[in-house]
């Protein structure tokens, strides 16, 4: 008797579910994708105990026909594919017909659905089998309830992480779906608490404001670009909002969230020298393309894809991010809280005195405050919850304008309690600002950007409010300032009417010299200085093999290395722009770069050499300068293409506004 036999359907479905349904967030992802594919404009996701107890997804999509209900929980039953060639023209998020079969094999599922001009139906499925099918009252669309996930696979349930971690995974998936489909109203509710609620306006920047907060949303820069095969659209946050991991990079292809090493690399190259090592940007990029150029059927969860013409897409992303930040003022803010312009400035002890009873009254009413630091401590991305939000009187409020500044008026005794009802003006202002941002992003006219930033600067005494503008004269992105002095022989202190500036002198000169060396290394020049006595270098046999392989690359950066017999090589000339007292050391360092990497392209070699030389030749810490030297250094920095970060991505200049300084000394309450 043969040993091979066909598995029972229920067992096969449990095995298949291992790939499709890894955790509660997998269920949310599959059901959310089905709702979007059904044409829903409103989707509600409700979870209890992070989805382990129940997950409910309700949409107003097309619904499921009564005659299709018998097949909906069968494996490989789908309405999205019909023949082989359809697999190469996929525009839906789902297409395999595995999701509902896999979910129903490891959970108890109740599905209610109704189509146009039809009666509703309800079916109950357990262990992959339909146990009940009956007519039911239902609105147009689909209402699916998944309960007792992994009830019949206890081993899987055992490896579920903490409820907090699982909720983070769910929130992450819903957030990304909301970003890629801003035209759909999406709500996520956990144990009765709203975690996310979007308005379906079609504006991605509004969704990002809901997820990351208005502080980040105001610093988003719109990008857009085309090639013959690709169109990209998205938002990239300014470098000061960088994070410690890649989790905040969101890439979509035709609305589908994907992970791709090369596209991540393209984004980081677009931010080149603007981010320090180990820091990653907040960004959203959607790539529209013909489905035939992408294979989405290479990964169980469709997270990884294979792309045609990947290099073309890579260069498009790099160039558009670089263009987004070119000529923009990117002076980072310090970590002090912001203070609205109209708050009281106290000049005497009597003015600063606040009665204890009044303070206690205010504190009792301000029970909860919203803090971006608290949000960032959470493992998931939702930062802007629907809790009652109370703004402290001295906290930064980006929506305070001349028409709503009374919300934090000077009358401290009023004990203003900022509830939802009294917050109508606040959220109205939020909507207006987002709409203005959207109009700005839709325009390629630099004037519209300037107008938006000028409006912001009307409400705050803060030079950073205009830091996102595109300067008409790129060499004037560093504001004029008066040199005050130097701290610890390392930081230059300067001031102007906007406040105080601190400039890292080493980082500033490193940027200046980096751009000089980068341009020189890239030049094809015959300006060579001959050496009276050639420099001799000795290498081991395995080092020789690497050097011989990359001799052409060395020549392209000006190093003419010649074999001199045995393990010896000589250099008899060098480019005239090499610092004369460090020629041998520089050549050694260049060769060591190649020996360490063992795989070097000319672009990376030039980059590494420019960074290395600029770092070696720049002013070090504890080096005291004369005032005219400080002034000359800042003037040279103004001429730089990217004067805000050193080649390693560290900030060069930081601004403390006048009001921030006053707050530090308690002159503003």
Swiss-Prot record:
Region ranges (Disordered): 356-379
GO biological process terms, semicolon-separated: mismatch repair
Basic and acidic residues: compositionally biased ranges: 356-371
Signal peptide span: none
Cellular component terms (Gene Ontology): mismatch repair complex
Top-rank taxon, per record: Bacteria
Pfam families given in the database record: DNA_mis_repair (PF01119), HATPase_c_3 (PF13589), MutL_C (PF08676)
Keywords, sorted A to Z: DNA damage, DNA repair
GO MF annotation, one: mismatched DNA binding
InterPro entries: DNA_mismatch_repair_CS (IPR014762), DNA_mismatch_repair_MutL (IPR020667), DNA_mismatch_S5_2-like (IPR013507), HATPase_C_sf (IPR036890), MutL/Mlh/PMS (IPR002099), MutL/Mlh/Pms-like (IPR038973), MutL_C (IPR014790), MutL_C_dimsub (IPR042120)
SMART domains cross-referenced by the UniProt entry: DNA_mis_repair, MutL_C
HAMAP family per record: DNA_mis_repair (MF_00149)
Family label: Belongs to the DNA mismatch repair MutL/HexB family.
Role: This protein is involved in the repair of mismatches in DNA. It is required for dam-dependent methyl-directed DNA mismatch repair. May act as a 'molecular matchmaker', a protein that promotes the formation of a stable complex between two or more DNA-binding proteins in an ATP-dependent manner without itself being part of a final effector complex.
Protein name listed in UniProt: DNA mismatch repair protein MutL
Species annotation: Staphylococcus aureus (strain MRSA252)
